[in-house]
Amino acid sequence: MELHSLKSTPGSRKEKHRKGRGHAAGKGKQAGKGQSGQRKRSKVRLGFEGGQNPWFRRLPKRGFKNINHIEYQPLSLEALEKHFLENEVVDLEKIYEKRLVTKRTLPVKLLANGKLTKKLTIHVHSASQSAIQAVESLGGKVEVL
């Protein structure tokens, strides 16, 4: 016995049944599609519910996406308190290095969460008014890029 002379066992390999190829073929006429109708002829479009009002028309329109919206990564005063020393300059590279924010693609916004007791010079893309006040009250400086 050699590989080129092997034959499959009779009945182990079934032939594919070709539907819709006449009555004599056994699966002619409706070809397993049921009665004649729209869904027999071809596919129905996406979202079609058989004539019932589809969900995207039943539900009301709501809201919009503001194309001018800027998504910021928050940076809290509490995080700066933990990771930086007195009189240190806090720039974006140091912030990324200490993993206080993760995505380099998004701008960083300083928020007044927590307490700050150190004088720092901070360079960020944006800052809240209360965060700027908290830093400047200690003699620090916030520079918005």
UniProtKB/Swiss-Prot annotation:
Keywords: Ribonucleoprotein, Ribosomal protein, RNA-binding, rRNA-binding
SUPFAM superfamilies, per the entry: Ribosomal proteins L15p and L18e
Residues covered by region (Disordered): 1-48
Disulfide bonds: none
One record GO biological process: translation
Compositionally biased intervals (Basic residues): 14-26
Compositional bias (Polar residues): 1-11
CC annotations in GO: cytosolic large ribosomal subunit
Record-level Gene Ontology MF annotations: rRNA binding; structural constituent of ribosome
PROSITE patterns to which the protein is assigned, alphabetical: RIBOSOMAL_L15 (PS00475)
InterPro entries noted in UniProt: Ribosomal_uL15, Ribosomal_uL15/eL18, Ribosomal_uL15/eL18_sf, Ribosomal_uL15_bac-type, Ribosomal_uL15_CS
Record has Kinase as a keyword: no
Similarity field: Belongs to the universal ribosomal protein uL15 family.
PANTHER family reported for this sequence: 50S RIBOSOMAL PROTEIN L15, LARGE RIBOSOMAL SUBUNIT PROTEIN UL15M
Oligomeric form and interacting partners: Part of the 50S ribosomal subunit.
The protein's role, per its UniProt record: Binds to the 23S rRNA.
Name of protein: Large ribosomal subunit protein uL15
Organism, scientific name: Mycoplasmopsis pulmonis (strain UAB CTIP) (Mycoplasma pulmonis)
